[in-house]
From Swiss-Prot:
Residues 1-28, 79-102, 158-199, 262-274 are extracellular. It comes from Mus musculus (Mouse). Gene3D superfamilies: Rhodopsin 7-helix transmembrane proteins. Residues 50-57, 124-136, 221-240, 296-314 are cytoplasmic. Glycans are attached at N8. This is Olfactory receptor 5P6. Keywords: Cell membrane, Disulfide bond, G-protein coupled receptor, Glycoprotein, Membrane, Olfaction, Receptor, Sensory transduction, Transducer, Transmembrane, Transmembrane helix. The chain crosses the membrane at residues 29-49, 58-78, 103-123, 137-157, 200-220, 241-261, 275-295. It is found in: Cell membrane.
Amino acid sequence: MAFQEDGNHTAVTEFVLFGLTDDPVLRVILFIIFLCIYLVTVSGNLSTILLIRVSSQLHHPMYFFLSHLAFADIGYSSSVTPNMLVNFLVERHTISYIGCAIQLGSVVFFGSSECFILAAMAYDRFMAICNPLLYSTKMSTQVCVQLLLIAYIGGFLNTWSFTICFYSLVFCGPNGVNHFFCDFAPLIELSCSDVSVPATVPSFTAGSIIVVTVIVIAISYIYILITILKMHSTEGRQKAFSTCTSHLTAVTLFYGTITFIYVMPKSSFSTDQNKVVSVFYMVVIPMLNPLIYSLRNNEIKGALKRQIGRKIFS
C-alpha cells in the first residue's frame, strides 16, 4: 500500500525508485557489472583492513586511517549497491518510508565520515613531512582516536540533520523518486509541504563539512609542497611525493564528483548525468580506493608479499 489517510491528507508509505534504466536487456548487463564491482569493493576493502591489522609494519597512523577509510567505503557502497542490484531484477522497485530514511541516513553518515577521514589523512601527511621530529607526539594513538571520533561524530550529526529534515517533509503523492536510491534532492521535489527549512539545513551542514575538510586538506598540502620544494635531496623529494600521491588521487576523485553534484548549478546538468556521477562516487570510487593505495604504496605491497609468503611456506 503506497498511500494512507493521515488527517486531512493522504500520506506516502513507500517510494518507487526509477533506477538507472527501463531497458530490460541493459538492466541485466548493468546487474552483472555492478555485482562484480560490489564484490571487488567488499573483498578489496576487507583485505585492506585485514592486511593492516595483521601486519605489524603497517601499524602507523596513516594505515590506521586507511583501514577506517576502507570501512567507510564498504558502508558507503553497501548503503546503495545491494538495493540497486534488486532494482535491476524487478519491474517496479519500491522502498518503504522507513527504509528510505535508513538508506538516506547511511549514505550521509558514511559519506560525511569519509570527508573527515580524508582530512585526517592529509593532516597526518602534513605532520610526517613538515614536522617529522614531532610526528610521534603529535600523531600518537590518543590523537588518532580523537580524530577518528571527530569523523564519526561529525558523520552522525550530519546524518541527524538530514534525518530530522526528512521526517519533517510531508509526502502526499506522487511517490516516484527519479534516482536509484533515496537521495535528498529528488525527495524534496516530491514534498507537498514547505521545504524552505528542510532544504536549507542539510545543505548548510553538508556544505560546511565539505568546506572545512577541503580547507584542512588544501592547507596541509600547501605546506607539504613548500616543504618538499625546500628539500635538497632528489630521493627525499620523490619519497615525500610518493607518500602523498595515493591520498591526493583519492581526494581528487571523491571531492571532484561531490563538487559536480552538490556545488555546480542544477541547470548545468541533467538528472541522468546526476545519476551517472552518483554511481561513480558511490559505487566505483569505493572499489578504486584499495587499488589506488595498494598499487602506489610500497609498504602495502611489501606487507602483502610477506603475508602471502608466510601462507605459502607455513
